[in-house]
Structure formats: structure tokens, C-alpha cells
Amino acid sequence: MKMNQIKIYLIAMIGLLVVSCESYLDTEPEGFISAGSPTVEGAEGLVTAAYAGIGNNDMIGPIASMWVYGSVRSDDAYKGGGGVSDVEPYNFYEQYNLTQPFQSWLAGLPYTWENYYRAISRANSALRTLNELTDEEFDLRQTRIAEARFLRGHSHFMLKVLFKYVPYIDENLSNEEILQTSNREYSNDELWNKIAEDFEFAMNNLPETQPQVGRANKLAAAAYLAKLRLYQAYEQDENHQVVNINQNRLQEVVDLTEMVIQSGNYSLQPDFAENFLNGYDNGPESVFAIQFSISDGTTAGRLNFENGLNYPHGAPQYGCCGFHQPSQNMVNAFATDANGLPKFDTFNDVELSAEDITPSGVTVDPRIDHSIGIDGHPYKYRNEDSYIFSNSWVRDPGVYGYFQSMKEQQAADCSCYKKQGPFMGVSTNIDIIRYADVLLMQAEAYIELGQQDMARPLINQVRKRAAESTGRTRFSDGTAPSNYQIAEYDGSNLSWTQDNARMALRWERRLEFALESPRFFDLVRWGIAEPTLNAYLEKEKTRKDFLNDAQFTAGRDEYFPIPQREIDFTKGLYEQNVGY
């Protein structure tokens, strides 16, 4: 698709979005029942609107899929598309060139900030109405309050991992007080605790199961609180460097994840593929997900369009736009040794191509064929000729290579798929927390507590499932497209010291969640973003010319800058992040 087509379409979208900072923080959702007339029906509608708020996503201000902010900014993926100038702000993020002037037609970060605060405003609107009702008037009042607080916690959490210091807005602030709330009202640790209060309330006031799918429950709140405490455990100084790992916070992570595990309400999907296929939404592995649907009575339906740029550009069934391409480093990371373990030290020595990834070629982790489109391999678990991935499907291989992301896409004949203009939307959910994440969060906490032996069986659960997930990746005759070799850690094939366990855990997270976006945030949490990403760039510069000037700057690039328009609007009340 030509650049001017993208601009025309997205300028029209922005026309619906651009409002003043004040209005998106204090405007009530459409259909809001005015103060003085709270009703149960009105409160229920506002809670529903708050759920919709966390999924009101778009390509110019993503809040559900973090592929731009978490994958492209890491060593997992390139921006892709039609060269570096195609959706240029995303190229700036990839290059860590984050001080470019505001581009009104396609800004990215400012609209992500805005969309999250719109979602927070919806949660607060629901809470204000619920607070005016009594338990006698509405027997589900406490449950709905807990749900709204969970949703508010989610949006504040995401803002925090993106920007670090953000204004905390709750339902008790007046419009005037909102305008006087600084993004530095709380210290880093205090802000974590403020956000945690919402998840703690939700955990203590929600049932373990809900009668309607998609609603937050007690265990989802416990899992999210565990995720927050894990991030908080890695204590940072003002320059974003990890200076301490808080053991008490790690123990909280163990206890909270154990609550989820022992409930028996969740398990790994039998086949890894089922996390990325239509028909398996809200399955046993989905702890909390953002819900989408193919039709809600509107023209476009309630579809996820945030990944609409990421389909194979040259595939006739799609036709656009070739973004979010796996990096060479990411592809290489799936290679395994003769024992079926990752090539921790040598994985990036050899540049793998489709000619290497064959039934008789290098041994690889099976998750490669769930994550990456490779020439000659079935795409999206379809083995008919029209879905065998081809190099001709890649939009700009001279810049970004021949691989394509695959997890977030769906087949063009799926009942979940709809093409709106040049872009693709799907109704499949976006998982925010999977059960695999719960297992690996607990494993990480155990390792950092010096109890790495407790972590090994947790990691092995994830690896065992990967080993058993090869049925859907095969050709029509039953043969595998790659030479799969993966083994569990038995304590002797890798000496299970704390350092080795940590290395194994971090590798497992990368492969399990490849191209799902956690990677950059993991690197920052662990305090290894600068050495990891600059080592990645040093090697990638020998492969990809467009990265020649890319450089990660420690003490700055761990977080995005506060959008300048927010600083201007608050007349300097908001402080810019260090380094910008």
C-alpha cells in the first residue's frame, strides 16, 4: 500500500480522536446518566463501557497490542513495511531516536497516552456512579467496583511500563484537581503501590469465576498483582538502572502466582497453536484477555485493527502491509543444540535462512513455526498451496529480510477476519496474561530468591507443551517443515546454578512470547536493556544497513518521553523523563 493511502485513512481516524487533554480526562462516556440519577442499568452500562475502553484500539494509538513498543523496540523484530519512511515514527522508535518533532498525522505515543487515559476516565465514570448506589440497590455493586478498579489498574500499569512517571487519576479527583495532578506526585515505588491498590481491591472483592466470559475475576487480579510486584521488585534509580532486587516483593510474586496455580482453574492449552487460532478465545490458558467481536452492529464491528498492518503484503489473500518482521536475531534464537537446548552462547554466530530451516536442516524449537512465516512452510497452520509462505509475500526484503510475524494474524477465510479498506481486522482476543506467564513469573521469582530448583519444573511445563505442539505445523502429508529438537532441563544437561537457571528462564520467556511484545519490557525490568540491545545492534548493523545509526542510550531509552503536548498543555506541570 502506498504511503499516501495510509495517511489519508489515518488522518480520517485522527479527526475522530483529537481532543484537548482536559476533555479526554474529564468527559463522560456517551450515554452517561448525569449525576443525581444513578441507576443499576446505568452503572452496568458504564462498567461495560470501561471494558470496551481497554480495547478501543487503533493503529495510531495502540493500547492492546504492544508490537510497536515491545517487539520493534527490542531485539525481536524490525518495523517492516515499505522501507524506513513507511509509518516513520515507528522507525524512530526502532532506532531509539525518540526526540523527533510531533507528527500530527501519525503520532503513535501521544495517542497511546490519550487512549489509555480515555480508558481510565471510563473506569472512573463507572466508579463514581457505583459509589452513589448502595449494596441494597445493587447486589453486584462491590463486584462491579472491583472490575472497574481492575481495568483502571491495567491502564495505569501499561502507562507506567511505557513512560515510568505518569499522573495517577482516580474517581475522587475533580476536573480542577486533575489539571493540578503532576506526573511526579509519587515516587517510582509509590506509584507502583498506588496502582497495586486497585488490583488488591479487585483480588479481595471479585469471585474466582464469573458467569460471563471476559470479566475480570479474583485470580486474574492476583495474576496481575503478581506481574506488578515482579516489575516493582527490580528497584530502579532515577536513571532507570536496577540497583536492588527486593526479596519481599519476589515472595509476594510466589504467593500470588501459587494462588492462581493451586486454584486449578487454569492450565496450558494442549497445543501452543490454540493460543493464536480462532475458536479458542477464553480457553484454559487465558487468565485475562481483551475481548473483540466480528460484529456489534457497526460498519467495522468490534475488531482488533492494531495488527492490521502486519499481514504478508504480497500474499493475494491479504495485500497489505508487511509490518512487524522478525529480526534475524529472533530467528536465530530458535536454534537448538544436539540435546534440544538453546544455543545460549553461539545462537547468533550463524545467520539462518529458509534453506537452513528444513526437515533435515538445523535443529530448532518447534515454536518457530508457530511464530514466524518462513519460505516453504505452512502459514497460520494451513498446509494447502495457497497458504504455503513464499518469499514473494515479503514487501521489502532488501531492507527487512524475508521473515514475517505470524502469531497475531488469521487466515483470510476465517469467520473472525474482516478487511476494512486496505487494513485487516480480526475478532480474536488479545491475551494480556496467559497461564504460561503465571508459571514463568513464579519461576523467575524463585530463581531470584535463590530457589532455582523450584523453578525448573515450572519452566519444563512450558517446554513440554512446546515439544508436543507440532501437529498443526505440518505439511498435508504429515511431515514437519523443520527439524524439531527440544528437551526439558533435567539438571545435568545444563548445570542448574542460579546463573544458568536465570539464563534459561529469560530464554524461555523470549521464545514462549516471541513477537507478542513483552521482550523490551522484560529487558528493562531485568536491568539488561542497554548491553543486550547494543550487542544486538552491533551484530545487526552488519546485516541490515537501516540500523547503522541506531544506538540505545542507557538512562534514557528505557522509557519513552512524556509527550510534549502534555507538558505544554499542563504549562510545565508534567516533568520530562530523564535524558530527553
Describe the residue ranges of each PLM region.
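Short coil/turn linking the two alpha-helices of tandem helical-hairpin repeats
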Residues: K160-L162, P167, Q210, L228-H240, ...
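Membrane-proximal, proline-rich intrinsically disordered regions
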Residues: C21-R73, R556-Y559, P563, I567-Y580
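Long, intrinsically disordered, low-complexity segments
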Residues: S20-E22, A77, F102, Y116-A119, ...
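Glycine-rich, aromatic-lined ligand/substrate-binding cores of catalytic
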Residues: P284, F288-D396
